[in-house]
Each structure stands twice: as structure tokens, then as C-alpha cells.
Regions:
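C-terminal motif of bacterial Sec signal peptides marking the signal peptidase cleavage site
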Residues: 15-19
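Bacterial signal peptide processing site
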Residues: 21-23
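Short, well-ordered beta-strand elements
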Residues: 28-40, 58-64, 131-132
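Short helix-initiation/N-cap motifs at beta->coil->alpha
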Residues: 63-73, 161-188
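Ligand-binding "clamshell"
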Residues: 93-105, 120, 192, 197, ...
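A conserved helix-loop-strand patch within extracytoplasmic ligand-binding domains
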Residues: 105-154, 253
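A bilobed periplasmic-binding-protein/Venus flytrap-type ligand-binding module shared by bacterial periplasmic
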Residues: 112-123, 225-237
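Periplasmic-binding protein-like
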Residues: 140-149, 247-267
Length: 268
């Protein structure tokens, strides 16, 4: 009896391993995709894409995340087929740090980062020693610092660009106190800060209209365009042509324009 139970257990474990292997390899289904997005604009846009896809026989299941780490992990591990939430500098940094085999296949929308405040209405109202929030992940933190520099709050060391950290601040005339926080949590902590740089998806999720509520915002032609990402092995799969065509359609462009009123800019 013991040998029979042991053999059965081995078969069970083997079947699990086989199932996992099947989930992370092979061509993506032409009838079903599981897509990871962050809550807010990326979720809303993908819901529109899913609506269009349904009419073409493609079912898109949307999994919503509230932070920036797990969508890439889940994709690499095979729990997702596609994700749509990040810009290329973030992807490049993230997959390099974690040795992930995932790649960009299309661009989506540009979501300008803004500076927000519940205490002041103009960036020039900042005072000596005020607290300034920014994302704690390397790429979005650098993006925020570059925005602060353009806004005239600081000067960064020459050449650091999207590798900038708070240690690269060369000049800080107001001796501002820079506080690094989880990007998704910054809107919740805005009342405790003089100002903060907030990614547009999280700003919209918390009820802000970036073009109206930010006190300073990136230029519309900033290079931080968002992208669709898949596993390297699936980058040429036929179903992705359908997904990209639907995403970059006139129907979706109109939806973005009407829904976000200039806070998001289509890349196509």
C-alpha cells in the first residue's frame, strides 16, 4: 500500500509540473488571452479593447494589479500572456535586475507624470525645507527627479538622465526634503507632503484629472510612452497582431480622447 501511495504521489507531482510547463511555453491561444494591467487608465482602456476583441472571437481576461512589480513577474512565470502598464525604461531596468525574458511588442499611450499638492496651487509657492514625494522605484524615481529639474526645483548632476537618484541632486536651493514612497501609495499620502510626483494612472485612480489638478505636468511629447509586453517566446504569435490592431484602433483612440480629456495621449 505504501508503495502504491508513493507512486501515486509521484504521478500527481509530475502532472503538476507538466501543467506548469504547458502554461509557460508554446504559442498563445488565438481565442483567449490573459492580460495584466494596473488599476485605472490601463484597466479602462483594456476593457475597451476586450469589448472590441469579443466581436472577433477573442476573449480577453483582465487581471488588475495595484503596483508595478507583480505584473512582470506574473508574465515571466506564465500566469499572464500579456501585460500593459509600463514604459520601456521601467521594463528595461526591471528585467535586467531580475533576468526576465520578456519584451515589448507595441506602444500604447503616453501618460505624463504630474506634480500634485493639496497645500499649494503653484510650484513657486514651495518653501524652505518642504517635503516632496516621489516614487521609490529607480526608473519612476528618476523620471520624477527629471520633472522636478524641468520645474526649476533642483539641478541634477550632468548626464544622469533616467539613472538619476536623490544622490545626484547637485543643487537644491530650497533644501527640499525628498521622500521616496511606493508609487501607488503617494496619492494616499499627499496630504502629508507639500507636493509629490504622481504617475498618471495612480492619479486618475484616486480621482485626479491630471490636466486640471496637477500644479505642474510633463510635456505631452515626453519619451515615457507605455508599451505592451509579452514573453520573448511569444513575441511573433499571431494573436498579438489582433490585440495590437484592436488596441491601436480608431475606436480606442476615440475612447481615450473622450474618457481622459488630454490626460493620456495615444502613440499611434
Amino acid at each position: 500500500m505504501k508503495k502504491i501511495i508513493t507512486f501515486a504521489l509521484v504521478l500527481f507531482v509530475a502532472s503538476l509540473l507538466t501543467a506548469c510547463a504547458e502554461n509557460t511555453s508554446g504559442e498563445l491561444s488565438s481565442e483567449h488571452l490573459k492580460v495584466g494591467v494596473t488599476a485605472g487608465p490601463h484597466e479602462q482602456i483594456m476593457e475597451k479593447v476586450a469589448e472590441l476583441a469579443e466581436a472577433e472571437g477573442l476573449t480577453i481576461d483582465i487581471e488588475v494589479f495595484t503596483e508595478y512589480v507583480m505584473p512582470n513577474i506574473a508574465l515571466d512565470e506564465g500566469d499572464l500572456d500579456v501585460n500593459s502598464f509600463q514604459h520601456k525604461p521601467y521594463l528595461d531596468n526591471f528585467k535586467s535586475d531580475r533576468n526576465l525574458d520578456i519584451v515589448e511588442v507595441a506602444t500604447t499611450v503616453n501618460a505624463p507624470m504630474g506634480i500634485y499638492s493639496t497645500q499649494i496651487s503653484d510650484i513657486t509657492e514651495l518653501e524652505e525645507g518642504d517635503s516632496v514625494g516621489l516614487p521609490n522605484d529607480p526608473i519612476n524615481g528618476a523620471r520624477a527627479l527629471m520633472l522636478f529639474e524641468v520645474a526649476g526645483l533642483i539641478t541634477l548632476e550632468e548626464g544622469v538622465a533616467d539613472q538619476a537618484t536623490v544622490l545626484d541632486i547637485a543643487d537644491n536651493p530650497l533644501n527640499l526634503d525628498f521622500i521616496e514612497l511606493e508609487a501607488s501609495q503617494i496619492p494616499r499620502q499627499l496630504d502629508e507632503l507639500a507636493v509629490a510626483a504622481i504617475n498618471t494612472n495612480f492619479a486618475i485612480e484616486h480621482g485626479y484629472v491630471p490636466t486640471e489638478d496637477s500644479i505642474y505636468i510633463e510635456a505631452a511629447d515626453s519619451p515615457w510612452v507605455n508599451i505592451i509586453v509579452v514573453r520573448e517566446e511569444n513575441k511573433d504569435d499571431a494573436v498579438l497582431e489582433t490585440l495590437i490592431r484592436l488596441y491601436q484602433s480608431e475606436e480606442v483612440a476615440q475612447f481615450v480622447e473622450e474618457t481622459f480629456q488630454g490626460s493620456l495621449i495615444t502613440s499611434w
